Amino acid sequence: TSRRQRQMCIRDRKSEDKELYYRVRDAVGEIRKYVTDKLGCQIIDNSLLIKLEKIPVIPEQFMGIGQFSSKEEYVYLCILLMFLEDKDAQEQFILSQLTEYMTAVMPGEITDWTLYNNRRKLIRVLRYTVEQGMVRVTDGTDDVFMDDAGGEVLYENTGASKYFMRNFSRDIMEYTKPEDFRESEWFEVDEDRGLARRHRVYKRLLFAPAVYREDGSGEDFEYLKYYGYRLSEELEQLFECHVQIHRGSAFLLSGQDCRMGAAFPENNSLADILMLAFGKIREKIEGKVWKITPEEMSLVDKIEFESLILDVKKEYGSGFAKLYRDMPEGEFIKNVTDEMERWMFIKKVDDMHQIKICPLVGKIQGSYPQDYTGGNENEQ
């Protein structure tokens, strides 16, 4: 199997790209052997789709569903999956059947479809399930429901929804806290040794932008200490990337030809703003204004950090896209810090009103050319 085949995103729906589906299907034996051995992940392989179940070691800020912005949308998704569970593949249903089912399962304000916000959230969930190939629109447009609770749309169940949720090794009704979901397959296994430790290290490197010693087991960095060179060679050969291991952090940096997942910086204005901010942060740290802890972190007062973000806007704002030039200060700070947190550049320590600056900030920064005079006022 070629390296390109190994790099494929193992979540190909046959109906969308048959050629890619069959290419992955031909290579799935070797891919399954690798991900089972190194990551402890399972592959679902059937006539509908091929999916790699990527279960993280540590839930991170960026791992939610990006299209969702509220808890209610996750509730709607779970009830929708319950609704589809009773439907056959290719079975059709109209939107009012779903809304009536949801109201019966969870009566109250959350399923009051006369409220525009509820309708908007449900449509966002349905659009997500369409994107994921769980349902398809057969007739109509969801805008009519957005405008009026009586609006109808005809959907078709593809049968793929039953493979969306993770299969747990234990009855989750026994769980009492979020931590119970973490790595439930390692229940009653010595997690700091052998196979489980290797799976943790590979997952943390491949599924997140950064690995920090303080976040997980210290045994993970012991593994990197002894096996890091061999692991680096292997991943660099397979995925066209470069692994860097430090005292308190480790990173998988994508190469120019790497096609594995999302990468920073993305080609957008917000990424440019972050890189400009990183340059300012670096100046503070190199100037000993902001101190570094033994774990390679820097703990800064939240107000002081937000002041730096605003300084970046004041100094470089003329070169920003119009959206960010005109954005109110509070909204600008939130957009920038949320994006930094999403990529694991910072952690918000809300109970202490502080920002923890992580080592990944030191890996990248940006600046405008010295002769740059500002942005185009006509830019949209």
Where are these regions (language model features)?
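Positively charged, polyanion-binding regions of nucleic-acid-associated proteins
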Residues: K71-I94, A271-L299
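A short, conserved structural fragment
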Residues: G40-C41, L126, V130-T141, F239-V243, ...
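Long, low-complexity, charged/polar intrinsically disordered regions in eukaryotic proteins
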Residues: Y22-F68, E219-G287
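Single conserved hydrophobic/aromatic residue that forms the stacking wall/gate
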Residues: T1-I10
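Short acidic, hydrophobic short linear motifs in intrinsically disordered regions
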Residues: R11-E19, A89-T111, L206-G218, K291-Y324
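Short, amphipathic alpha-helical interaction segments positioned at domain boundaries
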Residues: M146-H199, L360-Q380
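Internal, well-ordered domain-core segments that constitute the primary functional module
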Residues: M82-Y155
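Short amphipathic alpha-helical interaction segments
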Residues: A27-I31, D112-E131, D326-E339
